[in-house]
Amino acid sequence: MKFPKATYMYWQKRFDRPNPDQEIEEKMLEMRKEHKDYGCLRLKKELENQGIHVNKKKIQRLIKKLGIEVKSYTRKSRRYNSYRGKVGTVAKNRIHRRFYTNICHQKITTDTTEFKYYEVDTTGVVRQKKLYLDPFMDFYNSEILSYRISEKPNALAIMEGLEEAIQMTNDCPFRRTFHSDQGWAYQMNAYKNKLKQHKIFQSMSRKGNCLDNSPMENFFGLLKQEIFHGEVYRSLDELKTKIDQYTYYYNHKRIKKKLNWRSPVQFREAVKQLSNS
């Protein structure tokens, strides 16, 4: 096929011209490696944090050009339910979905979620096993303050996580509230007495109402979308390592719009620095 000389020269100049977006494209490719669920807006804000200002339409065009659209795999699965009936005292719902607070370490929430993995036993048979995660989150900035990982629902793991969360929030100048669902572990005398010992209010969601603890449910959803759904884990250690890595990433690097495009730790430290200046 023959082209007019003018057409040939036009495209030759286009191909020879340096790519004006090369730096931006390289930055975006680097970001996609670390932030697998970042869409257009978060990529734009990350670029701005590095001093690169680009409009939204250009970001969308470059995402399509580079083939880095978000492709996280999601799947609905049965939610783990720790409710075993009334095995102790059920606390009243003090939070009432009032999750917002401008006071660090004042409102804390917790819950348990379940993961599945596979291991080959001594006879060579592949067995499905379970792992349980018990985190404590600060409503102030959605930071995960403490967490424990165990192979079965475990009162000791929850009490250890509770103790660590209490110690980390001792600097709060106001009386604290620790929220949860009505799971068996949170009705235990040991759990309730530990809160009373530190003069902490206990709050519980209404029975079977996961929206009463939606910030924690959102964290579980993000965690499973990023590292669990669509993946197969062959050992406890492999899955545990992934959870450890993601929790650090979530706390220190994953920016949130409600935190002025900072990560939970970045937001907390920025506010602290501002109040000390």
What spans do the regions from the language model cover?
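Basic, flexible linker segments flanking DNA-binding modules
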Residues: K5-I103, N209, S263-V271
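Active-site beta-loop-alpha junctions of metal-dependent nucleic acid enzymes
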Residues: K129-K130, R148-D171
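Mobile genetic element proteins and their domesticated derivatives, centered on retroelements
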Residues: M1, Y8, M28, L43, ...
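RNase H-like two-metal-ion nuclease catalytic core shared by retroviral integrases
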Residues: S82, K86, S180-Q182, M188-N189, ...
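Short small-residue beta-strand/loop micro-motif enriched in glycine and branched aliphatics
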Residues: Y10, N141-Y147, Q202-S205, H229-G230
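Generic alpha-helical secondary structure signal
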Residues: F3-T7, E23, A157, G161, ...
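An active-site-proximal beta-strand-loop segment
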Residues: R97-L145
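C-terminal domain-tail junction helix/linker
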Residues: K192, K196, I200, L222-S277
